[in-house]
Amino acid sequence: MDRETKLRGLMGLCVRARQATFGEDGCLKSIRGGGCAVLLLDSGASKATQDKYRGVCDNAGVQTALLPRGLLQDATGRSGVAMAVAPGGLAEQIRQNLPVEGKEEHGQQMKSENHGGGASVE
């Protein structure tokens, strides 16, 4: 099973297990309050939105990952540009399955950045 397929399954499981937060206010509150281990961003989000989330994540020490456009919605069934994953086993499994920065998967580049919020993705 490739990383993207496994990541899709884990993201869906997070939603069903209520370990995911969506929406700008919910995600930002989760990040600032320490309830976010990793933030997944859709590459379809505007540069300003991506920069806003990354700035908040930098300050809070939360890892961010940029996913191919549409992957977040396909995997979770929810529209939106960001998903905050609560700390725990599912977050760790998602971290382990995030693509290595700069590695191409299925013709789309997926990037992960570690902002001091946990294990480095290598």
Which residue ranges define each predicted feature?
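N-terminal positively charged helical leader segments and presequences
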Residues: 32-54, 59-63
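Short, ordered loop/turn segments at secondary-structure junctions
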Residues: 25, 44-45, 69-71, 88
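C-terminal structural segments of small proteins and small subunits
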Residues: 71-111, 120
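Mid-chain, well-packed structural core segment of small domains
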Residues: 54-80
